[in-house]
Amino acid sequence: FKFGIDLETYFHALMTRITGLTGFFSFFSTYRLIKFMKKFDPDVVHLHELHAYFVNYGTVIKYLKKNNIKTVWTFHCEFMYTGKCGHAYECDRWQTECNQCPQLRNYPKSLFFDFTKIMYLHKKRLFANFDNLIIVTPSKWLGLRVKKSFFKERCIEVINNGIDTENIFYPRDTTRLKEKLGINNEKVVLAVAP
């Protein structure tokens, strides 16, 4: 089920850049998602990222809280506990209260205004009394960061990303492949992916 509307996603991205507010738009897409949830009536909702210009996360959180729906939320970045940053890097303002953001021009980009304090406080209020929320992170590092945020009193679990070391990621004899590609054995081949 695709609830997002492409044109609205572009509008959301534009409005984020103009206003500096992230996650406050996509009204029609969000309405479609909530309409689907009402019809489906889930016992549990498992969320991942909600900040790519496709949903009004505040409306979704309010719906889940109001309807007392058990929610597991896997955080893959720091967006939900910072003013706006996907990754705060060395900035630690999110531990007390975001403002005067040093990453204003980074994703999600704001061209004019710094509303990171408003967005930080908005998120903090949204999550207050969300008793049916469990947060999952795919790494210890992110789990420790979440525990330093306003989520520190929440249930936070680390479930590491799984790696299949028997069928997919295992040492292989690469001699033939190197020969085929014209790479001599003196060179090391390193592949890195996000």
Report residues per predicted region:
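A short helix/loop element that forms part of the nucleotide-sugar donor recognition site in Leloir-type
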Residues: 120-123, 169-183
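Conserved donor-binding/catalytic core segment of Leloir-type glycosyltransferases
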Residues: 136, 182-194
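A conserved catalytic-core segment of Leloir-type glycosyltransferases
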Residues: 1-44
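Membrane-proximal helix-turn-helix segments that form the acceptor-binding/catalytic region
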Residues: 65-66, 70, 79, 94-135, ...
